[in-house]
């Protein structure tokens, strides 16, 4: 299952990002270029993995976007981008978050009180981004029903976002500077 994705991940170079081992992959970084067959396998895999019982798909910038767009088109569910910069629009939700290698604010415009949301993410590393999103959404009356990721580096998805279904296509890691699949 997910043969193209597995092959692509295992070929990923690993770089040091301020002491954090970071794998570079077409799906998580857009580098090297994204093969359409690989993207299609990932999109189909996420659609099969998820329930998508939602009003909106949330796509964290940047690499959630190329995943959410084809899912939105295929399922007919609107998507909204979780941006790294704000617009100051009425109702804008501001989230402070920290990941394994960076921190900063995120901004959501679009979903409103009573909406049900699914987050589509390329990689869950520490779960910091999705935990921050879940708290912010809940405080604005938006129910996060599911988080779907291509890669899971957390090792334990059950703890990623308490009370929310979190699923990933592949469990992965980096050991001694090399990527590995944690099946």
Predicted features by range, described:
Residues 1-53:
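Active-site-facing substrate-recognition patch
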Residues 40-94:
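Conserved PRPP/pyrophosphate-binding segment of the phosphoribosyltransferase/PRPP-pathway fold
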Residues 55, 115, 145:
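Conserved acidic residues
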Residues 76-118:
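Short, glycine/charge-rich flexible loops or terminal/linker lids adjacent to PRPP-binding catalytic cores
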Residues 122, 127:
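Conserved G/P- and acidic residue-centered "switch" motifs that form tight phosphate/ATP-binding loops
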């Amino acid at each position: 299952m997910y043969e193209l994705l597995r092959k692509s991940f295992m070929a990923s170079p690993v770089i040091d990002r301020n002491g954090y081992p970071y794998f570079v992959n077409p799906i998580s970084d857009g580098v090297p270029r994204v093969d359409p067959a690989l993207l299609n396998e990932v999109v189909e895999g996420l659609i099969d993995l998820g329930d998508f019982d939602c009003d909106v798909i949330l796509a964290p910038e940047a690499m959630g976007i190329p995943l959410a767009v084809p899912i939105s088109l295929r399922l007919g569910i609107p998507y909204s981008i979780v941006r790294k910069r704000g617009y100051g629009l009425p109702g804008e939700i501001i989230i402070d978050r920290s990941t394994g290698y960076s921190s900063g604010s995120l901004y959501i415009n679009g979903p409103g009180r009573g909406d049900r949301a699914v987050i589509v993410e390329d990689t869950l590393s520490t779960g910091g981004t999705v935990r921050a999103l879940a708290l912010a959404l809940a405080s604005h009356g938006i129910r996060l029903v599911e988080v779907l990721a291509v890669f899971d580096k957390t090792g334990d998805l059950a703890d990623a976002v308490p009370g929310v279904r979190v699923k990933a296509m592949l469990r992965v890691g980096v050991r001694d500077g090399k990527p590995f699949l944690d099946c």
